[in-house]
From Swiss-Prot:
One of its GO terms (molecular function) is proton-transporting ATP synthase activity, rotational mechanism. This is V-type sodium ATPase subunit E. It comes from Enterococcus hirae (strain ATCC 9790 / DSM 20160 / JCM 8729 / LMG 6399 / NBRC 3181 / NCIMB 6459 / NCDO 1258 / NCTC 12367 / WDCM 00089 / R). GO terms for cellular component: proton-transporting two-sector ATPase complex, catalytic domain. InterPro entries: ATPase_V1_Esu. The keyword S-adenosyl-L-methionine does not apply. Belongs to the V-ATPase E subunit family. The gene is ntpE.
Amino acid sequence: MPIDKIITQINETAQLERASFEEMKRKEIDQKFEVKKWQIEADFQKEKASKLEEIERSYRQLRNKQKMQVKQEILNAKQEVLQRLFTEATLQLENEPKEEQLALMKQMIQTLPINGTARLIPGEKSADILTPAVIAEWNEELPFELIREDFTEKAQAGLIIDDAGIQYNFLFSHLIKEIQETMSAEIAKELFD
């Protein structure tokens, strides 16, 4: 029976080797599974962090864009208020009593460095008050002579003095615009701070 014993021993050895091989393969599979699982988890965490960063970046961009829009809207509203203020100032100047308008115009032209004669171009809205009598009265007091033109500056109040091509613009809208250009920032600071 030694053959039976050898066969049994071979079977037992084969069974042990198979069990050992199966155990080794199972551990190898488990190890590969764990490595793959860890890799998938790491990739997932990396992807999650990347997506989260992308969402945060998009949120920051959107928030900054909204802040800029709000600032722009506030700036536009302030500019609109300032523009309305200067438009109202022009209208108020145009609606001053006739005597005050004439006094203002006379005061402005008295400072001009003109010799000889100059042309007076009235604004359409002031043409009725810049009568020949008013101009004659001014000519008596001025060191130069004004000659009134027949045409007017359309839809304007005030006047322009033309001294041989050099024009002195005293239209009320122009005067207010000069104030707007030089004092806009200062007025805005007073109004909005």
